[in-house]
Amino acid sequence: MEYRSHISVMGPVVDVKFKSGQYPESINALKSTSRVRQNAVDVTVTLEVAIALGDDSVRTVAMGSTDGLYVYRGTDTGAPISVPVGEATLGRVFNVLGEAIDLGEPVAADDKRDPIHREAPKFEELSTTTEILETGIKVVDLLAPYIIGGKIGLFGGAGVGKTVLIQELINNIAQEHGVISVFAGVGERTREGNDLYHEMTDSGVIKKSAMVFGQMNEPPGARMAVALSGLTMAEHFRDRDGQDVLLFVDNISFTQAGSEVSALLGRMPSAVGYQPTLATEMGQLQERITSTKVGSVTSIQAIYVPADDYTDPAPATTFAHLDATTNLERKLSEMGIYPAVDPLASTSRALSPEIVGEEHYSVARQVQQTLQKYKELQDIIAILGMDELSEEDKLVVHRARRIQFFLSQNFHVAEQFTGQKGSYVPVKETIKGFKESLDGKYDDLPEDAFRLVGRIEEVIEKGKQTA
């Protein structure tokens, strides 16, 4: 079905008029071949149908730049945007349309493709078992453990370490568990995506990974849809191959992209200027991320918190869908504690004795109680000093500071910056280290020995060197 005219171009939103009686379906992809005025070069832009305007016209969202376009002709593809799936995607980097952007061979025309808009699995297809995913990162495994097939949110403002934490999780889980990973870069820095690709190539992890990018320099249409493109690739490995798949989304800023085009689409803005369909769009994505009786998709999502305000509609809407939250705190990063995970604000529904076991649960709660008590004492210390505390409170502060530093750890992906080897700590070793620290076994070791180390044995060795 062809069309010959665009009624208007409003940045990323394009109105298209069809011949009388011809009408594309909602979410269909239109291919628009247009001429750029500056250099008279033909460029093909993909448009996604968003709204029917009546009078044989539709309003669409462009997946590419519309700058300088003035001569138009195009066709309705008769189907939604689709992306390649299966083995052909492993080791490759794609854009939102499933086109390879890694300078490798183009994706073969006969390779399997799936549409990016799909229904969530039916209720009777879902799995009800709960299994813990070991990450090798102490603060995560101890205090906010991740669930296989769950949805995990990494919350933090700009520059507190969301991307580095995601990179470490990709590295650790790929090296230790060997599962397939799909990385969706949504509105992130191109430099970070490039660094991640080369790091994954150097480590060999890229062979079991697929990457999809819609970076911050791209139009909002691409940033809105790229998370769906990555999820579609992950779903294929789950549903057709019966595999456990990890979906990394950095970050869930497609909500911000939606707010950019919402007013142009003619929708009444909602709170803080966001689209009124925010909750619906979020639900359509999140409900597809789940465990079925065949396989699972475990999603780890970096969630940008505008101005560190957790009441902003974008992070607030995401909260309802998550099984675990990892909150990154700027004050901890300023103290040199990395990862800067807030041990008191981070949560997981898996942290219960029935799921993680009695010992793990007991140690985790004791760690949180000690850190909470230390937090309550900080105001007194700031005003009156340590000398005014009771002996019992002094001991709490003494141990809490060591525990706080022991929650930090060197990352493999940060070796080039720190000059120190990264560490993967099994859950059993993590529990053992914190249990002995709570019992006062290492009270005589200096605080600095606990900073940026892995197992408790490394603390002992570092303590001997600094003694």
Swiss-Prot record:
One of its GO terms (cellular component) is plasma membrane. It catalyses: ATP + H2O + 4 H(+)(in) = ADP + phosphate + 5 H(+)(out). It comes from the Bacteria. It is a peripheral membrane protein. GO terms for molecular function: ATP binding; ATP hydrolysis activity; proton-transporting ATP synthase activity, rotational mechanism. PROSITE patterns: ATPASE_ALPHA_BETA (PS00152). Its EC number is 7.1.2.2. ATP binds at residues 156-163. InterPro entries: AAA+_ATPase, ATP-synt_VA_C, ATP_synth_F1_bsu, ATPase_a/bsu_AS, ATPase_alpha/beta_chains, ATPase_F1/V1/A1_a/bsu_N, ATPase_F1/V1/A1_a/bsu_N_sf, ATPase_F1/V1/A1_a/bsu_nucl-bd. It is found in: Cell membrane. Keywords: ATP synthesis, ATP-binding, Cell membrane, CF(1), Hydrogen ion transport, Ion transport, Membrane, Nucleotide-binding, Translocase, Transport. F-type ATPases have 2 components, CF(1) - the catalytic core - and CF(0) - the membrane proton channel. CF(1) has five subunits: alpha(3), beta(3), gamma(1), delta(1), epsilon(1). CF(0) has three main subunits: a(1), b(2) and c(9-12). The alpha and beta chains form an alternating ring which encloses part of the gamma chain. CF(1) is attached to CF(0) by a central stalk formed by the gamma and epsilon chains, while a peripheral stalk is formed by the delta and b chains. Produces ATP from ADP in the presence of a proton gradient across the membrane. The catalytic sites are hosted primarily by the beta subunits. Belongs to the ATPase alpha/beta chains family. This is ATP synthase subunit beta. It comes from Cytobacillus firmus. The lineage of its organism: Bacteria, Bacillati, Bacillota, Bacilli, Bacillales.
